[in-house]
Every structure is written in structure tokens, then in C-alpha cells.
From Swiss-Prot:
This is Glutamyl-tRNA reductase. Possesses an unusual extended V-shaped dimeric structure with each monomer consisting of three distinct domains arranged along a curved 'spinal' alpha-helix. The N-terminal catalytic domain specifically recognizes the glutamate moiety of the substrate. The second domain is the NADPH-binding domain, and the third C-terminal domain is responsible for dimerization. Catalyzes the NADPH-dependent reduction of glutamyl-tRNA(Glu) to glutamate 1-semialdehyde (GSA). NCBIfam families: hemA (TIGR01035). Keywords: NADP, Oxidoreductase, Porphyrin biosynthesis. Belongs to the glutamyl-tRNA reductase family. Pfam families: GlutR_dimer, GlutR_N, Shikimate_DH. It comes from Sulfurovum sp. (strain NBC37-1). Its EC number is 1.2.1.70. Substrate binds at T50, C51, N52, R53, S110, E115, S116, Q117, Q121. Homodimer. It catalyses: (S)-4-amino-5-oxopentanoate + tRNA(Glu) + NADP(+) = L-glutamyl-tRNA(Glu) + NADPH + H(+). The gene is hemA. SUPFAM superfamilies: Glutamyl tRNA-reductase catalytic, N-terminal domain (SSF69742), Glutamyl tRNA-reductase dimerization domain (SSF69075), NAD(P)-binding Rossmann-fold domains (SSF51735). The lineage of its organism: Bacteria, Pseudomonadati, Campylobacterota, Epsilonproteobacteria, Campylobacterales.
Amino acid sequence: MYYQIVSFSHKNCEQSMREKLAFPNDEEKATFLEQLTGFEFVHEAFIISTCNRVEIVMATRDNFSSYHAVLGLMSQKGGLNFYELKSTAKRYDDEEAIEHIFSVVSSLDSLVIGESQITGQVKEAFRFSFQHGTAGRRLNRVLSYAVKCAAEVRNATNISQNPISIASVAVAQAHKLLGDNIQGMKGIVVGAGDMGVLAAKHLLRVGCDVVLIGRDLDKVQTVADSLGEDVKADTMENLTKYINRYRLLFSATSSPEPVITGDLIENETLPRQWFDMAIPRDIEDMELEKLQLFRIDDLRAISNDNHAMREEQAVRANEIVERYTEEFYAWLKALSIEPVIKQMRQHVSAAIEKEMQRALKKGFVPKEYESNMRKMAEQMFNRFLHDPTQNLRASSTESKNTNCIESVKKMFNIDTEHVDFKQYKNDHHTKGYSA
């Protein structure tokens, strides 16, 4: 079994391409996962689809085939050229894949280092796949380690103190542009999901009143009530009124198409500071003289200061990620040797049984001596196998001994391809991440 991640993130993929590759709804995500895991060489998979990344996380039988299967499905989904997609994609295999997912969950690979949302987003991505039958024990143990790693990063560094998100960067930029004048202004937030709620909270902190807009008034009203009396709820039907009256707008819906289009603009002379925090984009490209429009990728330069401030802590955090990656693979390799040892002992038991039956049938061993002879044979073989099994366990964590272990499997005709490794987990790791 192998691990692989195919990544299209803010580091290697422009926003316009990420928009085409994004999964705006659960139905599209479920269909893609069903198609991908339908290939015999893909054991399990889940999708991380956020404003900053689209990544396919897999446990595979063949990384080469899995990689090209992902590219093929993604090119069909996004209407993109296969080879263009291949030249853009970042591929992580095995230990690189494990280190990458640990970094992602620990918020070290984010556009804003230390942002607080990604851990929950990855957990939810796995939970979705688990519930749809496309992810299970193989990726569960990866996520279990990733969550533990993220917890240690948070506890051992201050990288996540005063949690930062794209929403906070956007509000900070608005504050920078408007200065103290922002106090008392009305900020329009389109979308009542996690990002919209974060934007509303940050606007309240800088002294703004907030209008929270969504499609379902009851849901939006519930969210608005939880944020306090300075937040008003309204529906998308009244969006035109707000964008032509107030200058500050933050949009983060899950709509597959822009919700703010040029035909909604009535007052072209109104100064506007708009922040599009959605993938795909919520705000259509438009030419307005007094419009300052910031999209996801525009916030990258703004967040560079945040990277610089946290660089020292990020070094410490990356050391933790490297250690957890080594520990995970050491555990995985140690785990993989147990079925080999068990089958060696099963072969011995079968040989003892076969020879005992032959000896009894031929009269070499009287029936009354059978129990003692069987016990003696078992003790002899246990003593004979003791040193080899101990050495196998010790060498299982060393990559240079992989060929040795494979040779043992070949010598004893041992097949571990279809073994359920779950029964061999040591006690420290049995709980894992609960889907």
C-alpha cells in the first residue's frame, strides 16, 4: 500500500484554475470520489477543497496509475487540458505525502500560517468520505496522526495564538485602507458559513455594524442573533439595495456562479472596498472607477508579513511535523511486520500438525504421547523462531532492511496484501480519529 496527494494550492495554481477544480457541493464531491475509488488501484480517497487548495488524498496500490487517474478525472471536471493540469499539479508520494498532510492540518502550508480553520476542514473532508464509503482505516490512521501532530504544534509553539484567517486579513486590509473611519460603518457580509461568520466577528471588533446576507432567512437570523445586536440579517433578494448603499462588502458563499454581477450596480460613483473570499469567485469582474476589489490571491502579499512574523515558530513547528512523519512510518513499518511473523508461526503450526498426524498414523508416536510430543515440538520451534522474529521487528523500521523482509516473505510464501492490519495496531494507536 502507498500514500499519495495530488495538490492544486495557492502555491502552484492560480485562482482561476482552482475555481474550475473546486467542489462547490457535496453531490459533485461524492460523484468524483466514487469514480476515483472505482479504480482497483485506489483503496481510499478524500478531497480537501477550500478557498486556498484542492487536494486529493489517497491510499493506493499504484501511485503512478492513481496520479494519472486523478488528472484525468480533474481535467474532465474542470474542462482543462490534461497536460496543462499535469504541469501544474504538485504530486506527493508516500513519506512526502504524509509530511504534507501533517503540515496542512497543522496550518503550516496555509496562505496565512497559523490560520485556524484548516484542521476542522480536513477532519470534515475525511468524515464526508468515510460516511460515503470512500475512506476508511488506511486514511483514518493518517488523519489520527495528523490531528495529534497539529495539537502538539499548537501546544509547543505560539503559531496559532490570535488565530488568523483569510477573513481577518481581509478586514485588516479594510481597516488599513479606511483607518479610524471604519468605526461606525456598515459592513455587508454575503454568506453565513464559517468564513462569513469570521468576517462578521472581525468587523464587529473594529467597530462596524454588520448586515449578514444569505439565502435562508431563518438560518441567517439564527447566526446573526448569536453574534449580537449589531448584526442584522437579510436575504439575497435585497442584496442590490446594500451594494449600492454601502462601500464595505465581504463575500464568501458556496455558489458555483458569481452572486454579485455588473447588472446589479446602480450607483457607480459610490467608493467601494470589496473582498471576495470565495472559490469559485462570488464577484464578477467589472470596471468601476471607484471599486477596490481584493480576491483570494490578492491577499497573499498582504499575508506575507504574517509569514515573516511567525517564521521562527514555523521552523519549530516543521521540526515537529518531521518527527511525527518519522514516527508514523516507523509505526507503520513495525505494524506491517506483524502479519509476516504471524504467518511464519501459522506455517510452523501447520507443519507440526501435519507431521504429528503422519507420525500417529505411521505408529511412530504412541497416542498417549501425542500431547507431550506436540508441546515439545511447539517449544522447539518457538525457541528456533525467537531470534529471527525479534530481529525482524527490530529491522522493520529501517528502510535499508525492506529487501530483507521481502525475502523472508518470499522464503515462507507469505502474502500480506489482503491482511486486515487493524488487528495488529498497538494499544497506543487504537483510538485514532473517530469519524
